[in-house]
Curated annotation (Swiss-Prot):
Catalytic activity: dUTP + H2O = dUMP + diphosphate + H(+)
Database matches in PANTHER family: DEOXYURIDINE 5'-TRIPHOSPHATE NUCLEOTIDOHYDROLASE
Protein name: Deoxyuridine 5'-triphosphate nucleotidohydrolase
Entry GO MF terms: dUTP diphosphatase activity; magnesium ion binding
NCBIfam families: dut, PRK00601.1
GO biological process: dUMP biosynthetic process; dUTP catabolic process
The enzyme's E.C. designation: 3.6.1.23
Pathway: Pyrimidine metabolism; dUMP biosynthesis; dUMP from dCTP (dUTP route): step 2/2
Keywords: Hydrolase, Magnesium, Metal-binding, Nucleotide metabolism
InterPro entries: dUTPase (IPR008181), dUTPase-like (IPR029054), dUTPase-like_sf (IPR036157), dUTPase_trimeric (IPR033704)
Residues noted as binding substrate in the record, renumbered to the chain: 72-74, 85, 89-91
Functional note: This enzyme is involved in nucleotide metabolism: it produces dUMP, the immediate precursor of thymidine nucleotides and it decreases the intracellular concentration of dUTP so that uracil cannot be incorporated into DNA.
Length: 152
């Protein structure tokens, strides 16, 4: 495994006392993001509702990198709680707080408490492309087959 990429991070006042995001296993791809909501003010996410959950983090990604905010599989499987705009993209030039847009697709209300792991963040290199207008594109066996064209 190569040396880790350094990412500067700042915790906002409402995240004071919370740990920084961390990997939960030696081979984990994502850092777990933590809810930075008030200790005495848990967020109740009713069934079918969505909410923006603050993390209290501001990061400075190196040029040529992005962060993706993705669901935690356990929250989705057990409670139907997932990241609505998955994956959420954090660009290298963004300097605002990272918030997580959660939605409760389950049938019961879900309570989010301060310090709870709510999503995961993956940092990855970005490939930039240059689009070139073309009069025709090369044919492929698949052609224009879209949704469901390769099976169930």
């Amino acid at each position: 495994m190569s040396d880790p990429i350094k990412v500067d991070v700042r915790q906002l006042p409402h995240a004071e006392g919370l740990p920084l995001p961390s990997y939960q296993s030696t081979q984990a791809a994502g850092l777990d993001l933590i809810a930075a909501i008030g200790e005495q003010a848990p967020l109740v996410l009713a069934a079918g509702r969505r909410a923006m959950v603050p993390t209290g983090l501001v990061i400075a990604l190196p040029d040529g990198y992005e962060a993706q905010v993705r669901p935690r599989s356990g929250l989705a499987a057990r409670h139907g709680v997932t990241v609505l705009n998955s994956p959420g993209t954090v660009d290298a030039d963004y300097r605002g707080e990272i918030n997580v847009l959660l939605v409760n697709l389950g049938s019961e209300a879900f309570t989010i408490r301060r310090g709870e792991r709510i999503a995961q963040m993956i940092v990855a290199p970005v490939t930039r492309v240059e689009l070139v207008r073309a009069a025709a594109l090369p044919a492929t066996p698949r052609g224009s087959g879209g949704f469901g064209s390769t099976g169930r």
